[in-house]
Amino acid sequence: MRGMLTLFLILGFIAQRVEAQHYSGRILDKETAHALVGVEVLTERGHRLARTDDQGLFSFDYPVDSLRVILSADSYRQRRVTLYSGRVLEFRLQPLQTELQEVTITGHGGTRGNNTFGYSPADVKGIATLAGEVDVMRYPQILPGVSQGMEGGMGFYVRGAGNGNNRTELDGIPIPAPTHLFGLFSIFHPDIVGQSTFQMGGITASSGDFTSSLLQIRTRRPSARRYKGSFALSPLMIGGSLEGYITRDKLTFQVAGRSSLLRPEFLLLRLLVGKDNISGDFNPQAQDLYGKLRWEISAEHSLEALLFGSHDYFSYLPEEEPNAERNKISLGWINKALKASWLYTPSKHLSLETSVYYTDCGTRQAQVSDGDWGVHKGLMMGSEKKELALRSHLTTRIHDIDLGMGIDLRQQHFRPMVQTLSIEGNKARDWRPAYTTTIASVFAEGVYRRPHYAVQGGIRYDLFRSHERHISHNIDLRLKGSLPLTRELGVEATYDRLTQYQHTLEGLPIGWSLDLIVPASQRFRPEHADQWYLGGFWSTPDLSVSLGGYYRHLTNLTAYRSWLNQFSLHNVSWEEDITTGQGNSYGLELWLEKRQGRLTGSLSYTLSRTTRTFSELNGGQSYPFSFDRTHILNVQSRYETIHTAHREQHLTLAGYLTSGNTMTIPIANYQAEELPFWNTQKGGILVPPEQEHHATTRTEMSTMNAYRLPPYIRLDLGYSFLWRRKKVTHELGISIYNVLNRRNPYLIFHENGRWRQLSLLSIVPSVRWEIRF
């Protein structure tokens, strides 16, 4: 009996020893102290235990008191550390090099599944761009569920929503117009970017006022112990950055800026070939400027000030001809942002950030004509949006739950349209009324992780006061759950209820910055989106695969009755030009990623259908969305040809195959009734055939977006060289956009009895040189 009792005691002791122990910690960048997303925590045999979230946190259970693990992330040195149960530890990983690396597109999902993706600037350097610029906003375009707008542009349409339903934030500041030169590339200098997170489902509740996706760009913390800088040159831009300390380990700074070379290049070309051989004057400009000042007051308190701005301008003045009308066209847009923040971190488990920011986004379009007999006339249009906000965000950890909560107070000023009509110096300016709205929000969210499941939930309450002083209340929900079935296999589900308090009236579908932004009101209520996602994932240290399906329902959408209305001079107001409706989208998404070895890359495929329904459009019948692309296939690959201590060379190859977008086309002509007094008005004067045709012939159009353009096919190629010297690093990138020189159709039209195709881009080579010190 005594022996049996002893045996039970021994077994009880052993069972107690093998009971699962809880491990948790946080992983940061050693140089910038930024949280690292997607760092894998591996056993020494390579089995994955956990992956860090968008705050750099990880947690898991394992049946030992201490455990030796490997911390692994692309672009960082692997590190072996020892974890101890019940203790929250912080680790810092050393970047492989201080400069950005030329790597392929191998972003790290902040969680497994097709809903959250974290990445750094190094992860986007392999994407070929028209400007040759490293562009942090290019990465979302190669993910599943994302459809591109205009070829080469930055507009993207996520799971059936519009380009204006996305939200882009720079350190929590919304940036309404985040692109340069009609959307060719973003306004964010690559040197200022630390980690970025792109969310399509299970979205954080700390951000609101959108119904599609959230792109959060976090800037780097300036270096506190050394000075670093860069200079870069490409065909379109010249730029540089500098960072360092004013007081070592206390007061640090970073400045960065870029400017377009198109205007100097045009003037040089005109000088070389002769002014007489170039017709007109062409003046494109693009600039961006960034500055950050950080003061580490103590281990617990820090202050930060941020300044950001961008400016775009384009004008064309044709050559003057005798007795001919000359039209000067100009347009431009600006972004201005200021932010001051205080960060209080009394412990590793508690932080409070309070900030105030101001943003100003404005657009202008003008056309001035020198008519016959010296008559001058012009039309100028513009819009602007200003926002002032106060925000406080608390994060903490209670037992196994990571919690976040806060408040968000915003006041917005919209001026949707300003018109100035000028004839012979007499100006008639129509300042459309400014609309002031207020949004007060309270939010809370939490993440609970266990070995066999993880649950994330968030709630956001908004009190919205429209410009008519009408108050409405809305509650957003953000839910995500994952259930591992084995160590590598699992399932994930999300639900999101989202609300947006502004409408974006898109003109030409190119994703540029001249779309009209108008506030929600009693007549045009806030937009809502409900989205469900269910999928599975399989992941090893080298390979990950995700497959899932989504359904999204959108309400209170707005659209022009005719997109030509935005260019009309006879508009009473924008309210009379638009109508409201709803949309639906559903599809399957596949994401495959290889992360290790000399050959790395990714593949994404989307099979989807998206429709819109407006009572005043298409006879009230549902019709395909303009960017309802049934099939979207993106393949990215990178091969490391040379890797030594002083040299690196990489070959990148990317392929794109998608269904063409849809459009409405003319399908027939028929004879119309003769206009009243038409013969009288002709008065015996010979009328040009084209004018006669339009007066007596009518065109029948197809149903809305009934025609689908041919498939979009593109192949990009790139090669990069990197040389490390004692004090400087040189990097040369060569890329060829559209190697096949395929003329992909942007639209088709019928002219002079023939169908014609408009294509925007052919083959475009580019070179970018960069030096870092």
Give residue spans per PLM region.
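Periplasmic N-terminal accessory/gating domains of Gram-negative outer-membrane beta-barrel systems
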Residues: S75-R77, R87, T111-I203, R220
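Transmembrane beta-barrel wall of Gram-negative outer-membrane proteins
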Residues: L236-S259, K275-Y313, S330-L352, I398, ...
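C-terminal beta-signal and adjacent terminal beta-strands/loops
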Residues: E265, Y656-T696, L709-D716, S720-F773
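Flexible loop and strand-edge segments within Gram-negative outer membrane beta-barrel domains
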Residues: F282, S302-K348, L352, D360-K386, ...
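Structural signature of Gram-negative outer-membrane beta-barrels, strongest in the C-terminal barrel
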Residues: F308, D400, G404, D408, ...
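Surface-exposed extracellular loop regions of Gram-negative outer-membrane beta-barrel proteins
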Residues: Y313, G362-R364, H413-S422, R487-W532, ...
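Outer membrane beta-barrel strand-and-loop segments of large Gram-negative receptors
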Residues: E387-R391, D430-F443, S521, R525, ...
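Gram-negative outer-membrane beta-barrel transporters
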Residues: R449, Y551-H553, E576-T662
